[in-house]
Amino acid sequence: MASLSLPITLKNPRFFSSSPQNIFKTQPQTLVLTTKFKTCSIICSSSCTSISSSTTQQKQSNKQTHVSDNKREEKAEEEEEEKEVSLREIWREVQGCNNWEGQLDPMNNHLRREIIRYGEFAQACYDSFDFDPHSKYCGSCKYHPSDFFLNLDLHLHKGYTITRYLYATSNINLPNFFQKSKLSSIWSQHANWMGFVAVATDEEEVSRLGRRDIVIAWRGTVTYLEWIYDLKDILCSANFGDDPSIKIELGFHDLYTKKEDSCKFSSFSAREQVLAEVKRLIEYYGTEEEGHKTSITVTGHSLGASLALVSAYDIAELNLNHVPENNYKIPITVFSFSGPRVGNLRFKERCDELGVKVLRVVNVHDKVPSVPGIFTNEKFQFQKYVEEKTSFPWSYAHVGVELALDHKKSPFLKPTKDLGCAHNLEALLHLVDGYHGKDEEAEKRFCLVTKRDIALVNKSCDFLRGEYHVPPCWRQDENKGMVKNGDGQWVLPDRPLLEPHGPEDIAHHLQQVLGKVNDDNFKPTTT
């Protein structure tokens, strides 16, 4: 085999983006690279951080053997790809109808791509949020719904249309979650942008998915970890159904249900906004032409993952996902990223009874999923007894299936004691891309299947190894949003204010969901 002369090295992060279908297998002192276009054998260290050439006859012979073996593997993989069923055929399994049995170990590639895609919906809530305290628009979304995905360069999401932005009142005791401007004249004194509701409208996308997908994406906290200190670790009755023993953490409940009557953006609570919009979309699409089913997918990261679970439970508890015209139960799936515990064991059991499917994607080194519920949680053998017999006020339980990932398995990430890195969403999506299963051989093989750009990891943190030469926290608006006006002065420009949805619009659908408008019966009972 002729010696290789490569213009790129493994130190270049673009190497992986530009080489489709890379498959890495580590042999002693050898890295084997297989692509759809060519197969080659590269000598490198086991850490995949240095490359050297081979001149000995023995190593040349080894190369030939590796090439032959991997050509056979490549052919088998290509044949397997041809046999692979389409997403539209297995979307129910990907959405968790069987609790992802047989899909996580090894990782099903359709599921991998969908986890990443929904994670990007959650990441978009960070990337579009104005957290600049020097801006009068601090706490709002920087983009209009019509060009939201275009501005974020999310071409894979262009088949969706955002139908409603979600807002919450900032007049609750979560100071590290809400962002406020330092200026006196601002877009809203009481509201923060919380996320959006979107629906798949492009017929090609609907056909690819196999159904009409309604997405609810919740924003997490810009401060990453500081918001944890705001949690009171107090359980309160959810009051979304008839069972007062179903309880969720008080801070999450307040964020979801509180409102500010004097504010046009939060005169309806985040709960009322999302329920009204889901009701409207189900009425519009739920009975459409035969052949199209509907799904509801809720996603969020960190505190946003908490809201994702609460809202998914709420929709199911109210039976909002039932379409009586064709007796169809719309499946509800939560893709949760780095989420904390939300409610007690009875809350977890009720989610299971209602058929809410939850896939929790976590980094094992992240501390957020371990709170609240340090004293009593789902790992405690007698939790059910403690809750039923003693009304223990600090008992929490995770809901759903866990996909636990380890950032130490990635050769691209450096060792760090920064807890924010372990909690970072882009880093988590990077781990999803490289994960292949729990067995020993799969854990050794970290291969980026979708070729997700590793530079994204450093978008808002410093986690990549130095040899990739990607600056930390690199994402920001050009000139931090400053522009030169007609007088030659640099200023933060005005932008068109988004008008809130009219109260009549929300009230009409809310009336059908809750039975009355501006319901005052959601005052929590704390324990």
From Swiss-Prot:
Regions of compositional bias (Basic and acidic residues) in chain numbering: 66-75
Summary of the tissues where the protein is detected: Highly expressed in flowers. Lower levels in seedlings, leaves and stems.
Knockout or disruption consequences: No visible phenotype under standard growth phenotype.
Family named by the database record: Belongs to the AB hydrolase superfamily. Lipase family.
Catalytic site: S302, D366, H423
Motif GXSXG: chain residues: 300-304
Classification via InterPro entries: AB_hydrolase_fold (IPR029058), Fungal_lipase-type (IPR002921)
Transit peptide location: 1-52
Catalytic activity: 1,2-dihexadecanoyl-sn-glycero-3-phosphocholine + H2O = 2-hexadecanoyl-sn-glycero-3-phosphocholine + hexadecanoate + H(+); a 1,2-diacyl-3-O-(beta-D-galactosyl)-sn-glycerol + H2O = an acyl-3-O-(beta-D-galactosyl)-sn-glycerol + a fatty acid + H(+); a 1,2-diacyl-3-O-[alpha-D-galactosyl-(1->6)-beta-D-galactosyl]-sn-glycerol + H2O = acyl-3-O-[alpha-D-galactosyl-(1->6)-beta-D-galactosyl]-sn-glycerol + a fatty acid + H(+)
Protein name, as recorded: Phospholipase A1-Igamma3, chloroplastic
Keywords linked to the UniProt accession: Chloroplast, Hydrolase, Lipid degradation, Lipid metabolism, Plastid, Transit peptide
Upper lineage: Eukaryota, Viridiplantae, Streptophyta, Embryophyta, Tracheophyta
Induction pattern: Not induced by wounding. Slightly induced by wounding.
Location of the protein in the cell: Plastid, Chloroplast
Pfam families: Lipase_3 (PF01764)
GO cellular component, one term: chloroplast
